[in-house]
Amino acid sequence: MKKHKIMQQKKYIARSMVKKELKFTPKKEKDTKIARTRDAASLVLLKKTRKEVKVLLGKRSEKTRFMPGAWVFPGGVLDKSDYKIPETTKLNNNIIQKLVVSNNVQAANALAIASIRETVEETGLILGKKAKNVSHINDENINNGITIMSKKGLVPDLAKLVYLGRAITPTFSPIRFHARFFMADAKHLLGKIKTTSELVEIKWIPLKTATKLPMADVTEFMINELIEYNGDISLIKRKLENRPMFTWKMGKQWITRK
């Protein structure tokens, strides 16, 4: 069984190198410095129906600089305001240890909040919880997904998050991220889907056929990871010690688990 899985993984790596990465990851000019990574977070949302499991994906605008036209999970770059958000439910302590933030609870919470905030901004969907006396952020420069939530009396519900994995953009890209992928069950969501300038199409796609869409290798990898577990969030939660880190080294995809 173990040998079979290893063979499957090697086959997947070779296929992904040819099909995905070259299309959606920009290349830096030769002899330029390697770009520093920026912290980012995505929220993978799954919906279970009687027949199948579906995943929420959005199509990026063709006008965007990074991965134009690719289908992605909602998410984005960590913002300074994500550190200022009060009154959230607690993120699982075991997840904090997996995020590579030196067990810094504030940094871990900020990443989790970023995934929820970006999802609100890009899709209109909210992973939130009603709270009494919600504190609004007294900063005129902050007008984002968390502001939208606070006006509805909601706070980010970090307790509903499950950790899927992380990824680092390869060094040959001029735009690089250290992304953490959280996930949650759609039954916990509030709000309605609405397209934005960033995601011009948003759909619930059957998990088993989702990789047929144009997407980056890391998105495909994470979807295949979900398929391995049949989209079972509770099972993935129990298998926390086996979460992947996805990157590229020496021109090849590099996947570690610990």
Listing of model-derived features with the role each one plays in the protein:
Residues K2-K258:
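N-terminal leader/linker segments that precede catalytic domains of diphosphate-processing enzymes
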